[in-house]
Amino acid sequence: MSKKTVASLSAADISGKRALVRVDFNVPLDDQGNITDDTRIRAALPTIQDLTQKGAKVILASHFGRPKGVDEKLRLTPVAKRLSELLGQEVIKTDDSIGDEVAAKVATLQNGQVLLLENVRFYKEEEKNDPEFAKKLAANADFYVNDAFGTAHRAHASTEGVTKFLSPSVAGYLVEKELQYLQSAIENPQRPLAAIIGGSKVSSKIGVIETLLEKCDKLIIGGGMIFTFYKARGLNVGKSLVEEDKLELAKSLEAKAKERGVSLLLPTDVVLADNFAPDANSQTVSIENIPDGWMGLDIGPDSVKVFQAALADTKTVIWNGPMGVFEFDKFAAGTEAIAHTLAEIGKTGTTTIIGGGDSVAAVEKVGLADQMSHISTGGGASLELLEGKVLPGIAALDEA
């Protein structure tokens, strides 16, 4: 699915026009209301700067947290301040996202100026994709740009509803890059293609695993979900996390991999803990020797070697989900080793894609984010795209 992009709009097309740009400025704040990580704001800069340089009047819309109505703590004021610093120009901030105050401020905008609307989720109509609310949001603009990949899997008023009232509706640079990497990895990858899927639950990754079994040459599984596979094989897993209702599914996934000739790799050894704590006692054992009363919190060193060998000849790797409880330093070695491995194979031309969520945090923790080909900004959106699902916020944009 090829979408029309902001890059295709010329200055002649949009100079003096009002652009409604959906961004994802849902950034973390500390107790004092200071932004602790501005990655999402920086990610939107290429689109904003492109529009201002082409002479558009830029109106930004974002959600922030999960407010139930107006919440003073969830106003976008700190975001406007940070964005002003990053752009090197004043960002005008409104106290609402629709209505007379907004219309009045938009009317004063000069070409190349930027205005940030208040948190669109202050209205419950946003998440209900209410057409009247979408119409009011769209009333102050001439065309629409979606650069909020992280919410593209939601059909909300500011991601989907507004496209019915604004034309053209196009993808921003961030959304374009996400589609380029995540879709081509699934639809037309350089092979061999390997996927590394981690995380604690099989249930949350079933769709991705099933899709990837159709597309991948190798599938590596780590994280807490491995114990559901082991138990399905009849192994003792101690008090490790197991989804009892997914044992048959685990068996069928292994059978499906075999049938398709996909190399499905599970860890050969695990790091165990006597309880779920950063300072727990630990021991490393092979998967056949997990004693009662212990729980697995990371993959072991032998597994790391096996996975490294499997990844050595790959041309494309998608990684979604950690290998263990990497928040605890004692149980972070497996996840960190995978991050280092991807950085290494990336140097020899392998495309490395970090598919959102906790694996992004893991790569950032070890300082290797800039050595990956692509780091997805979406959690749920990345997963759904990798599953081959249609994302409403993308589907609503104009075809190229």
Swiss-Prot record:
The name this protein goes by in its record: Phosphoglycerate kinase
Coiled coil start-end: none
The protein's annotated pathway: Carbohydrate degradation; glycolysis; pyruvate from D-glyceraldehyde 3-phosphate: step 2/5
Organism the protein comes from: Nostoc sp. (strain PCC 7120 / SAG 25.82 / UTEX 2576)
Enzyme class: transferase
EC number: 2.7.2.3
Main localization category: cytoplasm
GO molecular function annotation: ADP binding; ATP binding; phosphoglycerate kinase activity
Cystine pairings recorded for this chain: none
Source organism, top-level taxon: Bacteria
Residues spanning the membrane: none
Catalytic activity: (2R)-3-phosphoglycerate + ATP = (2R)-3-phospho-glyceroyl phosphate + ADP
UniProt: substrate binding residues: 24-26, 40, 63-66, 121, 154
Compartment(s): Cytoplasm
SUPFAM superfamilies hit by this protein: Phosphoglycerate kinase (SSF53748)
Any GO CC annotation of this UniProt entry: cytosol
Keywords for the protein's UniProt record, in alphabetical order: ATP-binding, Cytoplasm, Glycolysis, Kinase, Nucleotide-binding, Transferase
